[in-house]
């Protein structure tokens, strides 16, 4: 099993319990940073400290072209202990109504999920906000001052490597500091 390396609670605790309960090999990958935290030789707490500590590793990684890799493996053929759901063909509202969640909490209207929405938001921010991010990032009244990409990054809907590479192409050093720490 391959999972995201998340050294924060409760995720770290969940992973420890999973490791204790299974004999399945588990690989944790830090996919949220250009330079994974385990490569640092010391702890840092400020974005500029991280930048300084990772300068050489960062420079060798951030401008590399992304190479698409074909996955060459057998399809999983065993029986599942549940009926699979094809999200392309199902009625999402019916499916969601069956979830054990608080249905009184409405969706966030201006933050639709998915990669397409995430990259649309990123493209808009690149055009309207990235160049002035350093100036407007702490001004809550400036709507285009921040990227509002956190949910898309946190839940894996967009690639932090792609975002970092594209921000780097625009010379957005302060945005990269905030993205990567």
Residue ranges of each PLM-predicted region?
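Glycine/tryptophan-enriched, flexible segments
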Residues: 44-181
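Trp/Phe/Arg-rich N-terminal binding region typifying the photolyase-homology
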Residues: 2-70, 171
